[in-house]
């Protein structure tokens, strides 16, 4: 059904249809319960020392705190979020693309149009708002086909935080946000898959 809608909207004939799997065998995907998130992050960074990675955080404040924490400990990291001046955001993004900086700590504002093949890890410091967003964000890892690690740190407090923001919505927007949250929670709590 989705493919039919896309074909109709873009006016493609069925002869132009290519179907591929979302499965990326080079991505090691892990979900871990949050305990000491800063230490869990450091542990991951030590495994991928001097390699490129993205750390996604829920809020600008968390991005600033985590990037400052990492920089103070000698990691090559920069923040990226919509609250930064355009020039700073662009400078941090370009430094990451050029490998002048190894780690970008960002909100979901980061990533659209970025094609950096050598991203070795993606950490979700907080639960994403949707499974679709999560797939898109982890899809930035290992585009060169080499092994990469995707770590989602999960806790019920993340769910409560997202529920708080969902409660501010109304109607269909609220219903869709609840569906998205339920899907990512099911994924994070699925002990057979994760």
Question: Which stretches of residues belong to each language-model region?
Answer:
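Cys/His-rich short segments
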Residues: 176-194
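Helicase motor core with emphasis on the C-terminal RecA-like subdomain
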Residues: 1-179
């Amino acid at each position: 059904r989705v493919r039919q809608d896309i074909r109709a909207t873009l006016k493609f004939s069925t002869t132009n249809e290519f179907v591929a799997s979302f499965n990326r065998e080079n991505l090691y995907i892990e979900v871990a319960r949050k305990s000491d998130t800063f230490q869990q992050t450091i542990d991951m960074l030590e495994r991928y020392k001097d390699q490129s990675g993205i750390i996604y955080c829920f809020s600008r404040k968390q991005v600033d705190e985590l990037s400052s924490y990492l920089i103070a400990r000698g990691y090559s990291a920069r923040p990226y979020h919509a609250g930064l001046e355009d020039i700073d955001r662009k400078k941090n993004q370009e430094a990451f693309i050029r490998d002048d900086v190894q780690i970008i700590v960002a909100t979901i504002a980061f990533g659209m149009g970025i094609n950096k093949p050598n991203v070795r890890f993606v950490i979700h410091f907080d639960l994403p708002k949707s499974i679709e967003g999560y797939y898109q964000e982890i899809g930035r890892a290992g585009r060169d086909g080499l092994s990469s690690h995707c770590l989602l740190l999960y806790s019920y407090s993340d769910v409560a935080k997202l529920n708080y923001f969902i409660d501010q919505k109304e109607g269909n927007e609220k219903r869709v946000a609840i569906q998205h949250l339920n899907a990512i929670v099911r994924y994070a709590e699925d002990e057979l898959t994760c």
